[in-house]
Amino acid sequence: MARYTQRPENALKRANEFIEVGKPLRALDTLQEVFRNKRWNYAYSETVIEPLMFKYLYLCVELKKSHIAKEGLFQYRNMFQLVNVNSLENVIRGYLKMAEEHTEAAQAQSSAAVAVLELDDLDNIATPESILMSAVCGEDAQDRSDRTILLPWVKFLWESYCQCLELLRVNTHCEALYHDIARMAFQFCLKYNRKSEFRRLCDKLRKHLEDICKSSNQTTGVSINKVETQQLCLDTRLYLLDSAIQMELWQEAYKAIEDIHGLMALSKKTPVPKTMANYYQKLAMVFSKAGNQLFHAAALLKLFQLTRELKKNLTKDDLQRMAAHVLLATLSIPLPSAHPEFDRFIEADKSPLEKAQKLAVLLGLPQPPTRVSLIREVVRLNVPQLVSEDFRNLYNWLEIDFNPLNLCKRIQSIVDIIEGGPAESNLLTPYIQSLKDVTIMRLIRQISQVYESIEFKRLLELASFCNIFELEKLLVESVRHNDMQIRIDHQKNSIYFGTDLTESQREYRPDGPSLQSMPSEQIRSQLVNMSTVLTRAVSIVYPNRERDQRAKLRTQMVHHYHEIKDREHQRILQRQKIIEDRKEYIEKQNNAREEEEARRQEEESRKAKLAEQKRLEQEQEERERKRHQNEIQAIREKSLKEKVQQISQTAHGKKMLSKLDEEGIKKLDAEQIAKRENEELQREAKELQSKLKSQEKKVDYFERAKRLEEIPLFEKYLAEKQVKDKEFWEATEKTRIENAIAERKDAVSQQERLKRMYPDRDEYLDALKKERASLYVEKLKKFEIALEVERKKRLADRIVRRREERRQAFLREKEEERLRKEEEIRLAQAAEERAAAEARRLEREAEDEKRRAQYEKQRAKEEEAERKIKEDRERLAREVAVERERSEKERDTWRPRGGDRPSAPAGGAGEWRRAAPPAGERNDRGAERSERGGDRNERGGDRIERGGDRIERGGERAERGGDRDRKDDGGADSSWRVRREPDSQRAAGAKDAGGAPASRDDKWRRGGDRERDRDFRNDGPRRDRDDRDDRDRGGFRRNDGPRRNDEPQRETGGNWRDAPRQSDRDNRRPGGERRDRDGRDVRGDQRGPASKEAGGGGGGGNWRTAPAPRDEKPAAKRDQPQDKENKGGDDGEWTSVKRR
């Protein structure tokens, strides 16, 4: 039985009843069942579902069930995101508003609870509990109250924002609502100072943007190519950037700047100046916090250019203030190092150059800026002339004037002006320290050009900004980056500059005020100076040389110009034409691209409309199906009520039904109600067991409570024991220390007492050494003798060992020489084998190439033969048509006369062909043969068409055709269509054909059994392929025999590959007779005697009309002595054909 579900309006009414009796969880479950059941999803409009949804979300907020709210919101979105977007927007905004109100109420409640706690007892503000809590957790009362009361609601509100963002991220209809919720989430993070949630929110939005860029344009999807979408994303990222700066999350601010730059690059329209100004301002702030003074100054310079160019109502004071800001930021950039590539020796993810290039892209610069380029740009924009006199002097003192003795004093005056200026000057305060560092570096460089050495004291007097440690650090940094040659002498408290005259590791290009070069730089540039002086001397000695050379060069240039001016003029004109053509081509390409884009968009919109229409149709079908199911369900519910009424009439049924509510009754049937009675008995038994368990739990809880009460007593005992242990340890330690002091005093007194025995000890040792000196000398002599003996022994052993080593080395070299020779012999043999193999391969390739050429030649000849056959067939068809017309005329002329057919003359073919039979018989046979002739013409065409692929099917054709050629004894000029037949068969064929008697031409047709042709036709099974090909092309045929008619001889022999020739197959008399050849077809000797019904000339027995088994042996013929030998040759030819 299907599960019973309530209608939406009934569910809402029942949920209100549960709320009134204080059961919000039951009310939430009731409403949740409606959304879980897809039965009502599409059956009701938003006017019915929207109040239910508000009540559902209200309960979720009250009970802090964010996951249940998410389920309902997603279901509601699927129902109304394409039907009524306003309803979805109202529901989501109402849900977030309720969550925010409850969070604010919790915050007020937390503050009120702290205030009540603080004002609880004015006489005893610091209670013992508050003191202990502050010592344990380090939190005040407000933090503890917030963690208890406010933090759960903050977490719920955060989850609500995340759920709504996930809900709306792919819906183009709710795109504005999505970005509004994102801004609300930023405000939430700012209000409650949630930095970790802010980072996760930034990552979530960045992931959503990546998904939008990757995903295709679906029906309800968001397309990043839309201008509105790009603007909304840009505004949201700008708001994110402001929030990150307020929360001082500089890493997230930098990521937001990257996203903003990507969106501006993706947009086809230029952003408004206000947006760009805000972008540069925030970018400069981020660079400043990151400590990157160079890009900070570059961002301020871009902001200054943009404001100066686009802001019309800019006052002089604002312009002066901005110019001072830009100038001071640029001058505060640290002096660049001479070797910035030092950082590439440090392992990092990215090199400094790549990072600088990436930052330059954010500023829209083609390459990373430098301090020199920024100062040059500042001067080009006339910034020093826009600032006040003091800052203009600052620029001159740092970048133009050379006055190291007064430099720091002058800069100090500017620093005092900045520090003592008005409140708006506070923007310049962060640059003071950087300005001092730059001033000290300028001072050191200028001092190095004036003094060779200077005392620390004097240098500190000139550098009033820093102490000795800071100054020494700057000097070491200068040497580290190879900017200067400095040596510090701490013994003399002096500093030496540029003392190494042989060292100059870089080319010195001063980027500030300079008086002279360093000594090392002067040594490095001696050759350059000498070249300059020599050039000047040559110009003095030969004053006119340069003028003459210029005149000569000018003459050559004029002459060359007159030679090429016409050609250059034409080239320029041609270039203009090329440019115009290129412009036209580009314009055409653009137009075509735009048309293609328009077509593509139209196609996409059409597909979207079709998809939308299809979806609506499917939804309509789904609604109809669900409505039908609802009707069926209503019928089932009605029958269930009737059954329940029948059961309720009995006393037992009333007792059972009283324990069930309406919803439970609707879910059961009669059998299940009977089953519930047994379940009730089991339930009572379980209740008894549960009571016993509850008593057991009470005893357990009582025992646990006693032990909890004992814990403070145990802790008190342990604390007292710890105090006693500590006192005992201190007493023991004091006693140990006193004993150690006493022992040391005793040891010292013993040492002082024994010192008077030192002289006696020394006298005793001297006497002992004198007594044992002689013994030492004697032992030394024995050692030297033993040493000499051992040395000689070892020398002898070394001589023997070295001889053995030389012998082994000789044998080893001899063995290596033998192995080397064997290896050389092996390599030579291998090289010869490779050369022989290569030669064989080349020979095979040459042979294959030769065979391929022969095959192509044969193919060309066959194609030529087919063309001629086609021409002959067409010519013969025309002759047949003319002959038929003539026969018709003769028939019309001879038919009245009748009479017998005259006998055929004994002459040639021309004579007996004119001896025609009577008109009636001849015409009847002529008509029949004309029909058969047409069929043969058609079959002949089929043979020609099939003849084209005989080369490819050469295996099968060669086997059959080769046998036919070799079984013929027709001599060198006999075709496969001309075969010998038994005398009886020939006679029958001649009789049926009514032709001339056999003459000597018959032997020519049969191709007699000539011994002289046997060598050409049958030369054994080992015949070469080239000989066979030549034979097939007619190279071994003899054309000296008589022919049937006076037509010229064929160009090629009777090769089986040749297509059937019209002249061979269809040469017949005017009455339709075929030649005598048809009686002796290719397979005539295998088919037996020709049928008499085939017509005159034996033409009805075509080789295609009857089966001819290859294995059937022909009748014994005395004229066929070469059959066995030809078969052997044919097998060899079949193998050759397969190799091709």
From Swiss-Prot:
One of its GO terms (biological process) is regulation of translational initiation. Residues 319-502 form the PCI domain. Gene3D superfamilies: 1.25.40.860, UVR domain. Residues 589-632, 830-1140 are annotated as: Disordered. GO terms for cellular component: eukaryotic 43S preinitiation complex; eukaryotic 48S preinitiation complex; eukaryotic translation initiation factor 3 complex; eukaryotic translation initiation factor 3 complex, eIF3e; eukaryotic translation initiation factor 3 complex, eIF3m; multi-eIF complex. RNA-binding component of the eukaryotic translation initiation factor 3 (eIF-3) complex, which is involved in protein synthesis of a specialized repertoire of mRNAs and, together with other initiation factors, stimulates binding of mRNA and methionyl-tRNAi to the 40S ribosome. The eIF-3 complex specifically targets and initiates translation of a subset of mRNAs involved in cell proliferation. This is Eukaryotic translation initiation factor 3 subunit A. The lineage of its organism: Eukaryota, Metazoa, Ecdysozoa, Arthropoda, Hexapoda. The gene is eIF3a.
